[in-house]
Each structure stands twice: as C-alpha cells, then as structure tokens.
Amino acid sequence: MRTYEVMYIIRPNIEEDAKKAVVERFNGILASHGSEVLEAKDWGKRRLAYEINDFSEGYYNIVRIQTADNEATDEFQRLAKISDDVIRYIVIREDEDKTRK
C-alpha cells in the first residue's frame, strides 16, 4: 500500500456551507475509491505565495491517504481539474522509508 499526501486549495470567496460541502465531496471521493483516509487537516484561510486566478488567499486542506492503486488519486485529480471551487491541488507520493517508521 502506498501513502499519498493530497493538498488542495479552495477559493476564498466561497460560503462556509459550500466550503464544507466541497471538503466532504473531495475527501469522500478519495475514501470511496478504495483508499483509506489516514488524516485530514483543514489549515484554514492562508495567503498564497502568488495570485492564482486573481485570488491572493485560499482555504488549504491536506489529506493523507493509503491506497493500493492510483484509482482514488486519479479520480480526485480529474474532478479537481474541472471544479471551479478548487483553485490548485497537488498529489504527492510519500517515500516508503518515511511511512515505515
């Protein structure tokens, strides 16, 4: 099983209820496609290093998952790419040495 860290930034002008729905939707996508959510963190609203789509802030969410295949991460990336609410995302595979400790 491989461990991944998924980080995504939600646009800052979203309503609180809509933000919660987006977080539940994307975390649910990861969980429903055969991965186990190890940890989910909401970092809140933070300033971006540079503007993205005319936004200088965004809501950061970080999720650590464990999965046997890439189905969950592929589906997450596909849906995040077409979502207007997610302004940036990245999926990183953690080193196996780090996860074994």
Curated annotation (Swiss-Prot):
Signal peptide span: none
Keyword Ribonucleoprotein found: yes
Entry keyword set: Ribonucleoprotein, Ribosomal protein, RNA-binding, rRNA-binding
GO CC, one annotated term: ribonucleoprotein complex
Spans traversing the lipid bilayer: none
Single GO term (MF): small ribosomal subunit rRNA binding
Gene Ontology biological process terms, A to Z: translation
Job description of the protein: Binds together with bS18 to 16S ribosomal RNA.
PANTHER family cross-referenced by the UniProt entry: MITOCHONDRIAL 28S RIBOSOMAL PROTEIN S6, SMALL RIBOSOMAL SUBUNIT PROTEIN BS6M
Family under the similarity heading: Belongs to the bacterial ribosomal protein bS6 family.
HAMAP family tied to this protein: Ribosomal_bS6 (MF_00360)
Protein name: Small ribosomal subunit protein bS6
Gene behind the chain: rpsF
